[in-house]
Amino acid sequence: MMRLVRYCMGAAMFASACTPALKLTPSDAPTVLAHQVLEAADPGLPGPYEVLQLYYGSGTDKNRVEYRDSVAITTEPVDASKLVSLGGAADSRNEYWGFTPKEMPLNARVWYPKGDGPFPLVLVVHGNHSMRDFSDPGYDYLGELLASRGYILASVDENFINGARAENDARGWFLLKHLGEFEHFNEEEGNPFEGKVDMSNVALIGHSRGGEAVANAAAFNQLTHYPDDASLTFDFDFDIKGIVSIAPVDGQYLPTGRGVVVEDMSYLTFHGSHDGDVTSFHGLRIYDRLRFNDSGDFRFKAAVYVYRANHGQWNSVWGSGDIGPRSARTLDLRGLIPQVDQRRFAEIYVSSFMEVVLKGRQEYLPIFRDHRVIGQWLPSTMYITRFETNAFRPLATFEEDIDVTRGTEDGVSLRGVSLSTWREATLMLRSSNRPTTSASQENQAVTLGWNNRIAGADTTRHRPAASYSVELGGRLAARWALGRQHSLEFMLGPTDSTPRP
């Protein structure tokens, strides 16, 4: 007994000596989240509908009983051979799954409300993970919540392309094929979804590689041909109103060497500061590329950075192990917020997004403009947000040319006085998953520096005070019909460098 006690004490002392103190940024949550301004009902709570569940798929799955013996609707396989290449692993993968890319299944688990409908349709797709540790059950919490609030949610099975290379175009294409199935379900007499699917109100959610895949799907939805092989034709054109990217990658799929551009739909992305897999907020790149060309129907885009959230806890299967079974040896998991809190955040924001985009409930829009309006609902951590609507008109994005004095809109001029630093450059991400495609935010900004000390060798007291101005042309206000209801917005951030004298 004494040996055991001494051994345990020694182990405790060893662990204490080898484990550094946890370093976290002091939280402003007690102040920032102290108030509740929004008077709408909590969107993260279950709604009035009884939730039903079913599976659809091949009915022949070798590895999962739900897609073999439990399918309520049988679907036909699709030929994905132009989009999926298994390389040297083809034989072993085909043996494990029992099919090749020429006959890949359309499988999904569906949560839906009991009732006549029609109900808006939401698809969610996972990202890359061990193909044997099935990822599609991991969004059950979103399925249960959204179905109770009057949505049909299908968690799409794409485990059979996990571990393959250069497959993220296929990941998006599969989503569109699933939408085609729901269109058929809605029209087929005797189908459980007959007449219950509102195909005019569709949204997509993706996590990790799935977060980029929903952007690919949104782009493919408007195309007639596959960009990498025009012999594959597209005929989709579904009414996708919005997409959500959870901790997404970006740059896995680069058609013609360029990032995919999403157009004319609402967008939400969120990412955790303690993401141990996708270590930078790549969703900001999709956010910045997104274009609002049509000023008719209201649309918006929003981004939220969540302090102490990781990559895997958005999926109940993945959990805290962002880099696999050895995560606890490499990552300090003590700093993570609890999974229940991370999922609570996702429930609030995803549900609010669907309420605004698919049901037109504008009372939830302030959540995206300023998270502080729901301080009493949010988990106690820190958040950084961005927000923009299709009413936004840029004066200066610093993207168009190398002239630092010219703005984006005709007639806008930029002027600096007594600045020690004045340059335009590309913003960088905090880290790079892949140096060739992941180091840049793909977003330009102007960097300004000044020194207004009134004494010392580096004084500027003999010069005018430093200033930077954005000057609007004389007719711009009239051309844009500007009035008191409009506001001027600047996005500012400090740097860690010191300006020159």
What are these regions (language model features)?
Residues 225-248:
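A conserved short beta-strand
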Residues 22-117:
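Short conserved active-site loop signatures built around small residues
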Residues 134-154:
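Short amphipathic alpha-helix adjacent to the substrate-entry channel of hydrolases
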Residues 260-339:
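Active-site-adjacent alpha-helix of alpha/beta-hydrolase-fold enzymes
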Residues 22-29, 36-43, 308-311, 317-474, ...:
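Alpha/beta-hydrolase-fold serine-hydrolase catalytic core, especially in secreted/extracellular enzymes
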Residues 115-117, 166-212, 220:
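Gly/Ser-rich "nucleophile elbow"/oxyanion-hole loop immediately N-terminal to the catalytic nucleophile
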Residues 213-217, 278:
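Hydrolases whose catalytic domains are alpha/beta-hydrolase-1, hotdog thioesterase
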